[in-house]
């Protein structure tokens, strides 16, 4: 089962990302013109709902952050995998923990609900 989801990055960080059940491979760059904060989609539909309207970044004001998101939108191919350590570069804490880390990609600008 495969899904297409949009993720926003601060820089051209290419690679394969995965959680316990899914991996995401950066395919290509997309320049979009519609407001990202209106988008609501599911990246890892078993555990994460990615809601752009609730995206925040600590050191940048909300308005400026949304403008930066519009400049850097990347298309990810999301597919199911069995082991998070297979790719081992995208780790998430779910539920009420809003913490995430990305190995080799420290400039990823995403904070989940």
Swiss-Prot record:
Record's protein name: Uncharacterized protein YOL160W
Species the sequence originates in: Saccharomyces cerevisiae (strain ATCC 204508 / S288c)
Lineage of producing organism: Eukaryota, Fungi, Dikarya, Ascomycota, Saccharomycotina
